[in-house]
């Protein structure tokens, strides 16, 4: 774990995922199923793989290119637009990651997707977004307010927020 933490920037790992792992390592089981919503090229799932997790799932509208990962690194991947719903059972995943995805979701689909993310979460959910620092005519980051996402999740009685960093737009959630 120390080696991963020391090399997280070079490997592109989320420091917030590392903080989560460091805080809750004693509560985690290597048999947990982990879903990465908007998984990209599996960067975050590979972090969990390096720690010994094997039940890794990813969903994204784009096909990932894990060519630099070892052959034994396997992800159960579904290519799908996540705004159309997550094709998983309720509480199917002990850990759900959603890193730097929500800011690309149209507002009309955002809360439906949040409901779906929470629906498939059995224990923990980690959410990170990125502030839009300036308006661009053809920018991909859509206008949203992170504090609205936080308030929405706070309104869900079956979840508690275990860490939040409003300014950095980071959130850890646990199902109660």
How does the language model describe each region?
Residues 94:
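Acidic donor-binding loop of glycosyltransferase active sites
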Residues 105-106, 121-122:
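Helix-to-beta-strand junctions that scaffold the AdoMet/dcAdoMet cofactor pocket
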Residues 97:
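A conserved beta-strand element that flanks and buttresses the S-adenosyl-L-methionine
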Residues 100-104:
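Short catalytic micro-motifs in class I SAM-dependent methyltransferases
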Residues 86-91:
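Short amphipathic alpha-helix with an adjacent loop that forms part of the alpha/beta core around
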Residues 112-116, 120:
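Short, conserved SAM-binding segment of the class I
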Residues 1-32, 37-85, 109-112, 124-176:
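Class I (Rossmann-like) S-adenosyl-L-methionine-dependent methyltransferase catalytic domain
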């Amino acid at each position: 774990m120390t080696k991963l933490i020391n090399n997280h920037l070079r490997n592109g790992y989320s420091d917030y995922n590392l903080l989560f792992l460091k805080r809750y390592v004693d509560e985690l089981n290597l048999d947990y199923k982990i879903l990465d919503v908007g998984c990209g090229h599996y960067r975050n799932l590979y972090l969990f793989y390096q720690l010994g997790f094997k039940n890794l799932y990813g969903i994204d509208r784009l096909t990932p290119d894990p060519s630099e990962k070892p052959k034994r690194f396997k992800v159960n991947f579904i290519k799908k637009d996540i705004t159309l719903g997550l094709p998983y059972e309720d509480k199917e995943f002990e850990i759900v990651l959603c890193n730097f995805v929500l800011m690309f979701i149209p507002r009309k689909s955002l809360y439906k997707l949040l409901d779906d993310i929470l629906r498939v979460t059995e224990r923990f959910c980690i959410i990170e977004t990125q502030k839009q620092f300036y308006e661009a005519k053809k920018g991909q980051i859509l206008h949203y307010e992170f504090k609205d996402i936080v308030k929405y999740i706070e309104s869900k009685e079956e979840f508690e927020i275990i860490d939040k960093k409003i300014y950095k737009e980071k959130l850890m959630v646990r199902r109660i």
